[in-house]
Structure formats: C-alpha cells, structure tokens
C-alpha cells in the first residue's frame, strides 16, 4: 500500500491544473499497488475513475478529515478547504463507488468545535456515508510552543475573548509553551462518542483503523490468465 496525504493535502487548488496526483495514481494503478489517501478535498472525485480501477484490482482506502458540521464556522477555520456539504458529498460518492472510507474527526477546538451537537452531527454523517470507522485523537488540541503566537492571533480574530479562555485551560506557567488545551466538555464528548459509535458499529480502535488503512489485497490473485493478458492489445 502506498500512503498519500499523511503530511500535507494531496489535492490543493494547484492540482486542478498540474494533475500531479492523478498522474501518480495512474502509475500506482499501472503497477497494481494499493493506495491509502487522506484528504479534506472534494477534488479527489476528479480521479474517482482511477481509484475505482485500483479498488477493483487491489485496494483503495480514503480517509476524510472532518472538523465541524457548521458551514459558517468551517469557512472561517478552513477557508481554503472543501465545505461541509462538499465533504459529505465526497463521502457519499466514495460509498456509492464501493471505496471504503475512514473519517478522522478534529481537531476538537475548545469553545469552537467541542459541542455535543457538533459531534452528533458529524457522527450522523459518518453513519450515512457508511464509513468503516472513526478516528478521534482526544478531546482537545495540542499546541507547540513555536506556534502559540500565530494560533492565539487567529483565536483573537474569531473572538476577542477566546485567547483568555484558552489560557484559563492551562496550568500556571504553561502559557507560551507546548501544551494541550482540553475541552471543558471532554467527559461528555467521550461518553457520547463511545456510546454512539458502539451503537452504530463504527470501529474506533486506532490500531484496528491503522491496520485497515494499510492492509494490501490482491483481488486478482488466483485468476486464470488468458492469452490476451500477455499482450498490450
């Protein structure tokens, strides 16, 4: 399996003209590798035909990242990314194409995306799209020391009260240092996440999800070759 998108978005706006991702997928398809993609972008659907070819021969898994069910908030938090509606469309299109999906929820931003209503809405989208599982790395956000100034400036743009509210989540002496901001709703969110995913049959174990995304499958092994398989006709 070839992993794509673990460090950066494989479908930025420039991909519309450059077609680098499509050409890469065509090479993966030609040499019959499997692929596991992580994205936030509906632009992936442009290459759905290639992904379907890969899925027929080997294995294709797509991991879609969801942050909020609120369109207005999504536009402010991720202005360069696909909208909430577009990500729903992406998940449903992959479902209809028979391509398995996993969803990563997050980051969970205190006072922004940490409401029970938001989590319920996102999980409902996952159930509707028949995703295999949901990965959630905690009920808060970790901030490295070097990123604190920029992060807090962004919080201030969203609401002047947010920086002070975030500082109140930290123990004394941790402001400006690497720290985790745990949502005040963490306990309630954890309970809702656990009961809802169990009731819906969504896999949440990180190791199982890792194995699912990385497992290669040769769907054509054992097939009888024909004379025409030997030639590029």
Task: List where the protein language model places each region.
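Conserved AdoMet/S-adenosylmethionine-binding subsite of the radical SAM
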Residues: 1-166
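Auxiliary Fe-S-binding modules of radical SAM enzymes
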Residues: 117-233
């Amino acid at each position: 399996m070839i992993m794509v998108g673990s460090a950066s978005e494989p479908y930025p706006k420039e991909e519309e003209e450059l077609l680098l991702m499509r050409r890469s997928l065509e090479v993966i398809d030609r040499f019959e590798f499997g692929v596991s993609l992580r994205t936030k972008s509906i632009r992936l659907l442009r290459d759905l035909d290639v992904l379907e070819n890969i899925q027929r021969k080997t294995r294709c898994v797509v991991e879609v990242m969801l942050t909020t069910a609120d369109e207005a908030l999504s536009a402010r938090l991720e202005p360069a990314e696909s909208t909430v509606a577009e990500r729903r469309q992406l998940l449903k299109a992959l479902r209809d194409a028979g391509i398995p999906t996993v969803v990563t929820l997050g980051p969970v931003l205190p006072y922004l995306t940490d409401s029970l209503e938001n989590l319920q809405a996102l999980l409902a989208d996952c159930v509707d799209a028949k995703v295999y599982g949901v990965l959630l790395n905690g009920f808060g956000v970790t901030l490295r020391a070097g990123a604190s100034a920029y992060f807090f400036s962004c919080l201030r743009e969203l609401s002047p009260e947010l920086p002070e509210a975030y500082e109140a989540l930290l123990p004394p002496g941790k402001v400006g240092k690497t720290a985790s901001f745990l949502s005040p709703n963490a306990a309630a969110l954890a309970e809702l996440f656990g009961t809802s995913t169990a009731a819906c049959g969504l896999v949440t174990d990180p190791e199982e999800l890792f194995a699912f995304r990385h497992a290669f499958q040769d769907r054509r092994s054992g097939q009888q070759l024909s004379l025409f398989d030997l030639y590029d006709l």
